[in-house]
């Protein structure tokens, strides 16, 4: 019996050793391939005019400029939003010629370079300002935050108000959000995710997995689907944003001083059951009635009402901030670009 158990453990040990050796070999291969795989996607994007790498200080940032309008909207991405440049190019088609979009990214997003520095709110803002100057994009700017970039835009417009003529919060993170847990199992899980993700980025595993498994999303991006796929395959998003989530938010919220810069905070809350059905049809091409009812009830919950109240308090603390709701997807502009474009034009009318 004991010999049988020893034999089983010996077999398991050998299998584990083989897997470990295989992992080590693949890591070496992927690390060697990382640069060439990223360059392949850069070449695809360059052919379609989506490459404009400029110095952001210690790394190169891809700064895509769409249009030559007087009013320059600096669009900042959500967490790991690979397709922002394409989204802004598509959205620009709904706006007047005097409005231009400038899509900026963060370290490791799309084809932007990587950084060894700590990804803090201050670092993101300063590196983005440097990149815009090097790209020849002059102030004043209209900042547009989506989701995770909310704290960065909040800090920017409070730290350098002389550079900013307007702000658009597109369903972005605000002081209404809860902090990440800083103890117990949730903290351990976060730290593990950061460690594994950082290792995968550095060793080429992220790039290799994207090259093997990432797929085109033709329904959302049409003729630009291959470009969004190229951005995704090239991306090695920095996990410093996850690690520094709480401190980055605190830095932003502590900087707030009410000012007169025109702002609009656009949410995507469902107001009716029909809103939910429209969203599900947009997302899946069909409507699950049970799911629609469930999502609608969630949108009417006490927690959601309290969250919306906190967003209103956040807007009030910023000064001169109007609240607008467009029932839609998280991105808003992908499902309802015309309605979103109208709100941009209304903000610019306030700036003029």
Question: Residue spans of the language-model regions?
Answer:
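Active-site loop/oxyanion-hole signature of alpha/beta-hydrolase fold enzymes
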Residues: 106-142
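An N-terminal hydrophobic leader/cap segment in hydrolases
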Residues: 22-52
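Conserved serine/cysteine hydrolase catalytic core
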Residues: 219-319
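Conserved HGGG/HGGXW glycine-rich cap/lid loop of the alpha/beta-hydrolase fold
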Residues: 65-111
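Conserved hydrolase catalytic core segment
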Residues: 139-181
């Amino acid at each position: 019996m004991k010999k049988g158990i020893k034999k089983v453990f010996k077999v398991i040990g050998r299998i584990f050793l083989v897997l470990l050796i295989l992992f080590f070999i693949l890591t070496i291969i992927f690390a060697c391939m990382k640069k060439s795989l990223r360059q392949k996607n850069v070449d695809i994007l360059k052919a379609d005019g989506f490459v404009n790498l400029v110095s952001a200080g210690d790394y190169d940032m891809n700064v895509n400029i769409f249009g030559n309008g007087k009013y320059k909207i600096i669009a900042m991405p959500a967490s790991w939003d690979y397709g922002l440049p394409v989204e802004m190019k598509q959205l620009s088609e709904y706006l007047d010629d005097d409005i231009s979009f400038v899509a900026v990214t963060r370290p490791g997003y799309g084809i932007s370079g990587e950084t060894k520095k700590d990804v803090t709110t201050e670092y993101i803002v300063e590196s983005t300002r440097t990149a815009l100057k090097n790209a020849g994009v002059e102030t004043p700017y209209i900042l547009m935050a989506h989701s995770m970039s909310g704290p960065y835009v909040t800090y920017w417009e409070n730290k350098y108000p002389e550079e900013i003529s307007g702000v658009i919060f597109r369903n972005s993170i605000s002081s209404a959000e809860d902090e990440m847990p800083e103890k117990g199992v949730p903290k351990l899980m976060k730290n593990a995710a950061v460690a594994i993700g950082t290792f995968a980025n550095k060793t080429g595993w992220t790039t290799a997995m994207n090259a093997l498994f990432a797929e085109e999303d033709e329904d959302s991006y049409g003729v630009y689907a291959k470009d969004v796929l190229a951005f995704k395959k090239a991306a090695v998003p920095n996990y410093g944003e996850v690690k520094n989530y709480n401190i980055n938010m605190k830095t932003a919220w502590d900087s707030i001083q009410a000012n007169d810069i025109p702002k609009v905070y656009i949410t995507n809350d469902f107001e009716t059951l029909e809103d939910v059905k429209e969203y599900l049809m947009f997302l899946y091409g069909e409507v699950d009635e049970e799911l629609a009812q469930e999502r609608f009830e969630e949108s009417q919950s006490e927690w959601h009402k309290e969250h919306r109240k906190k967003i209103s308090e956040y807007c009030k603390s910023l000064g001169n901030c109007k609240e607008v709701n467009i029932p839609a997807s998280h991105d808003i502009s992908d499902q309802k670009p015309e309605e979103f474009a109208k709100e941009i034009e209304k903000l610019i009318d306030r700036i003029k």
